Amino acid sequence: MRPEKLDAAAIAEHLHKMEGWVLAEDGGSIWKTFRFKTFAEAFTFMTQCAFAAEKLNHHPEWFNVYNKVDVTLSTHDADGLTELDFKLAAKMDQAAEGRMPDHM
């Protein structure tokens, strides 16, 4: 079953509840940069997120350099954002809890 694309109001409602996630200019994806104390913390975060992504069968676009992980989420099958993107974003936020320095 193809995921249903969210409308602008639903996207805004989700984003209002989430810290640090930004809607792309074209409205088709959300992104966030996670910064950790060390590379090991970043890698642990990515590993935990990979397991969550597999369970959801929804995979992020991400880029890692040392302690920084840039994440972009969208649902290509829906050509935009779906509930899956926000579910995975929430799982990523949970995985990052307690791992990121307070000042970043």
From Swiss-Prot:
CDD domains noted in UniProt: PCD_DCoH_subfamily_b
Any Pfam family the entry gives: Pterin_4a
Keywords associated with the record: Lyase
One GO term of the biological process aspect: tetrahydrobiopterin biosynthetic process
Reaction(s) this enzyme catalyzes, per UniProt: (4aS,6R)-4a-hydroxy-L-erythro-5,6,7,8-tetrahydrobiopterin = (6R)-L-erythro-6,7-dihydrobiopterin + H2O
Gene Ontology MF: a single term: 4-alpha-hydroxytetrahydrobiopterin dehydratase activity
InterPro entries: PCD_sf, Pterin_deHydtase
Entry's EC annotation: 4.2.1.96
Cross-referenced HAMAP family: Pterin_4_alpha
Similarity annotation: Belongs to the pterin-4-alpha-carbinolamine dehydratase family.
Protein name, UniProt field: Putative pterin-4-alpha-carbinolamine dehydratase
Organismal lineage: Bacteria, Pseudomonadati, Pseudomonadota, Alphaproteobacteria, Hyphomicrobiales
Gene that this polypeptide is encoded by: pcbD
